[in-house]
């Protein structure tokens, strides 16, 4: 099997050296070239035709975002962004994902060499995922049509959503058309700390419903979406007659914290047939067992179809496990989940 050919673009000579060490330490990939800026990278892309590009967000001569936008228009290819953990860095990274980047890795703030080398397996996994990702499914999505407001639903009704690679844009596409009469939504997207708040704030500006990073102990309200904070699990709990959110630092599940399975299992237990579960694009199997638990508890469950997924891993695993009632295109997810939650349609298996 041929190796994954990687080209790294970063203005830091140290970062280029570290990325080369990391990529070349894995037998299934190789660093074919590095570039100090996008202008040099343009010629190297033509010369080496890499499978995956790693791209620093902030660089001289040409900004990483400007280069990414031009690249996706003229020569689309899988890109993994390399970002700082600052507030500005997280906002720029979210914009990069909107423009078509597949995923991102974060630079440690201290001890760059030791920190990046510690991330070696994670970086390799993101490069492998990017190499297999569907670029056709990851074209920038147009704003979906706003759905008509439906009847106000019981506060017992809620929707749980899980996603990973490609999920930030998929979630935006699902939330943007939702009317204020929507039930509460609990969302777990695999993301590091710092990024989830920026992600929630970005969505809050784009959506009619309120979107925020979830906080421990807060009451779950209709017309609001709650994003699990990075590196912390989110569960649905009860306080008397009301739902509330529980945030905790339990061990990683399926190598993830936050984990979709943790959310889905809690929703199965607390909401049962009053819930709809949705699993979107992502690598791995997180959420499959939890979605089966939701279906067995009477919830209606939806999976994004392969044609519209950047990575079909998580939906495929949930389908194969028998946890999915219906498979739909991303463009139909919002409408279908609202239709099912309004009709109260649920089945037991």
Curated annotation (Swiss-Prot):
Residues 152-344 form the CheB-type methylesterase domain. Residues 5-122 form the Response regulatory domain. Its EC number is 3.1.1.61, 3.5.1.44. The keyword Phosphoprotein applies. Signal peptide: none annotated. One of its GO terms (cellular component) is cytoplasm. The active site is at 164, 190, 286. GO terms for biological process: chemotaxis. Phosphorylated by CheA. Phosphorylation of the N-terminal regulatory domain activates the methylesterase activity. InterPro entries: CheB-like, CheB_C, CheY-like_superfamily, Sig_transdc_resp-reg_Me-estase, Sig_transdc_resp-reg_receiver. It comes from the Bacteria. The modification 4-aspartylphosphate is found at residue 56. GO terms for molecular function: phosphorelay response regulator activity; protein-glutamate methylesterase activity; protein-glutamine glutaminase activity. It catalyses: [protein]-L-glutamate 5-O-methyl ester + H2O = L-glutamyl-[protein] + methanol + H(+); L-glutaminyl-[protein] + H2O = L-glutamyl-[protein] + NH4(+). The keyword tRNA processing does not apply. Gene3D superfamilies: 3.40.50.2300, Methylesterase CheB, C-terminal domain. Contains a C-terminal catalytic domain, and an N-terminal region which modulates catalytic activity. Involved in chemotaxis. Part of a chemotaxis signal transduction system that modulates chemotaxis in response to various stimuli. Catalyzes the demethylation of specific methylglutamate residues introduced into the chemoreceptors (methyl-accepting chemotaxis proteins or MCP) by CheR. Also mediates the irreversible deamidation of specific glutamine residues to glutamic acid. This is Protein-glutamate methylesterase/protein-glutamine glutaminase. The gene is cheB.
């Amino acid at each position: 099997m041929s190796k994954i050919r990687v080209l790294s673009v970063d203005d830091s000579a140290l970062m280029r050296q570290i990325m080369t060490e990391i990529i070349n330490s894995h037998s299934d990939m190789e660093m074919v070239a590095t570039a100090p800026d996008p202008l040099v990278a343009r010629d190297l892309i033509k010369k080496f035709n890499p499978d995956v590009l790693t791209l620093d967000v902030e660089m001289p001569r040409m900004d990483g975002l400007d280069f990414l936008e031009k690249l996706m228009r003229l020569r689309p290819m899988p890109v993994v962004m390399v970002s700082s953990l600052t507030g500005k860095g997280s906002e720029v990274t979210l914009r990069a994902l909107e423009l078509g980047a597949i995923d991102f890795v974060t630079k440690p703030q201290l001890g760059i060499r030791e920190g990046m080398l510690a991330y070696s397996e994670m970086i390799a996994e993101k490069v492998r995922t990017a190499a297999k990702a569907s670029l056709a499914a990851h074209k920038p999505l147009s704003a979906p049509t706003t759905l008509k407001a439906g009847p106000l639903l019981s506060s017992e009704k809620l929707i749980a959503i899980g996603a990973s690679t490609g999920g930030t844009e998929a979630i935006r596409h699902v939330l943007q058309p939702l009317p204020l009469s929507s039930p509460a939504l609990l969302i777990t997207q695999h993301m590091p700390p710092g990024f989830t708040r920026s992600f929630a704030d970005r969505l809050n500006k784009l959506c009619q419903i309120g979107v925020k990073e979830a906080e421990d102990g807060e009451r779950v309200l209709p017309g609001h979406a709650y994003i699990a904070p990075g590196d912390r699990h989110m569960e649905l709990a009860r306080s008397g007659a009301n739902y509330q959110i529980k945030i905790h630092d339990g061990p990683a599940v399926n190598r993830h914290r936050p984990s979709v399975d943790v959310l889905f299992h809690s929703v199965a237990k607390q909401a049962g047939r009053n819930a709809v579960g949705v699993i979107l694009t992502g690598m791995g199997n997180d959420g499959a067992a939890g979605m089966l638990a939701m279906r067995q508890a009477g919830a209606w469950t939806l999976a994004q179809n392969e044609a519209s997924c950047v990575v079909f891993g998580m939906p495929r695993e949930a389908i194969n496990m028998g946890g999915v009632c219906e498979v739909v295109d991303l463009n139909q997810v919002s409408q279908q989940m609202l239709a099912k939650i309004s009709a109260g349609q649920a089945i037991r298996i």
